[in-house]
Amino acid sequence: MASNLSAAGSEVKVHEQARYVDTGRIVIYVVLICGAVVAIIPFFLTVSWSLMNLSEATGQALLPRSPQWGNYAKAWKEADFSIYFFNSVKIAAISLSGQLVFCTLAAYAFARMRFPGKEFLYSLLLATLMLPEAVTWVPNFITITWLGRVTPIPWMNNWPALTIPFMASAFAILILRQFFQQIPEELWDAAQIDGAGHLRYLLQVVLPISKAPMMTIVIFGFTGAWNSLAWPLLVTTSPDWRPISYGLLAFLDEAGSQVHLRMAGSVITLLPVLVLYFIVQKQFIEGIAHSGLKG
């Protein structure tokens, strides 16, 4: 009889635990769904209004009766997006290329090499993640101005000032270092037996298996460079050097009450980032998971 009571008690506990787990999952799903809805609604309205005519957009309709695809061409032409768009492409491409090279080398050094003060330097690097981006604008601007005086290279109103500050990223180094540390030590031992040094090991062994974190860096690096606005305004005086974010800002003022064209300009600005994300989203998610940064 005692065994029956014990079994019954265990069964009740199991049911209570299952009920608790199910309730917890339901709460998590509800929170996630609410978060997704809050994130999606602004994007949905932007796309929807960009396809409306003026009367529909000012009437706050949710869906266009007849999609006006010509709004995108009209917004592109009126905002003169061609100059700003290709400026942003150049800024993002140069910045991202430099970031991948320098951050990969730095992350590998912190993950696999031994040198005096490594942990202290890495701690300082992580501390920079606490700094707001705006805090770095003044010292970077002073540095750029000084380099323009002491070197023959023109920095202001030129690609160096627009791209080099984006090539250093503590966040990128953190992600890559976390991944590099998870690579089995046996691979390094085997590479040493084959006579490989650190550079050959990095190029032939580490990088081929680091596609996921690399794509994560590509997403964050491209998005940061593409969306930059304040820094380009500081180091340029001519619109001919400014990115598409500046073009959108200027167009929002010029378009005035033409809500549909303003939304079309916003979609044009967002499109490259969205396309890139959908191309590499699988590797991006894997990179976040493997880096140990998932929530």
Q: Which positions does each model-derived feature cover?
A:
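A structural signal for multi-pass alpha-helical bundles of membrane permease subunits
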Residues: 24-295
